[in-house]
Amino acid sequence: VKILLISKHSKYEWERKQLSLTHDELVSKYNKERANLDAIMEAHEKQLHVRTTFKRVFTDSKFCMMHELSDTITDYDMVMVLGGDNAFTYVSHYIKNIPVLGINSDPDRSTGHLLKWSATDDQSIFDLAEVIDFHHYGISKWTRLEATIDGKVISPATSEYFFGERMRKNMSRHILVYRDKEYEQKCSGILFTTGAGSTGWAHSSSNIPPWDPSDKYAGFVVTEPYMSECNGGELLPGEELTLYSLNDSEGYASSDSWEEFEFMRGSEAKIYIGSPLNIMIPKRV
């Protein structure tokens, strides 16, 4: 079995890299910001330990950091992602048909709604190796969203798309075409969410009840609407929802809060159910 093992950076690693700071400089910054230095360093050590243990147990796998990805992943039988939900959705943008397993690398600090295994200790990693060796897992097909803006395909969304103004203080405006009816809306933006994303942003903004990631439909919610006749609904397979932008400041769309696309006045977006994401569901040993 050819496995690609992908890991997130710890907060400490990422900020040293991005800010080009020495250890002492970053610690000084954390102290100035009243950050919990002990918790940050404990999480860093946990990430390093889990990463090292996975490399030692899965000796034949190829390893990379998530931000080293640049093209669609091919030539592997499965992908394993070490991190949290954000790392999982990031990597999912590079996956088409290959089964993927999200692994919570720090379950004490991360909920990991989208992750189907947890690295609670070293034994849990050995157990996962046994699960894979004996094929004790199934595949669940999670619904994903796809979209075009002005005819150009954008990245799929595992959790959600957002369309609106970049700045919260600016009103988002668009025309929503849903099931042959048009609605001109003023709001704080519109969210299109899958079952995988239904426990996150859309739930927090509108308290919608979550649904299973494998359910073959998506939902949408208009956030903070002003006198709107249509504040939400379902999107079924074969349906297509159209959005015409009336944003005149910094209108944009985002996919899983990772990738961004311009969505200014006059732009047209079409949103629909796309190809599913194949999720590995281990059977506990």
Label each PLM-derived region with a short phrase:
Residues 3-9, 14, 23-26, 41-69, ...:
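Catalytic phosphate-donor-binding core of small-molecule kinases
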Residues 17-18, 91-94, 203-206:
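Short amphipathic alpha-helical segments
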Residues 77-78:
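Structural motif
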Residues 81-85:
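N-terminal glycine-rich "phosphate-gripper" loop used for MgATP/nucleotide binding
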Residues 87-89:
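Short, well-ordered alpha-helical microsegments
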Residues 92-106:
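A short, gly/pro- and small-residue-rich
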Residues 193-196:
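Conserved binding/recognition cores within well-folded domains
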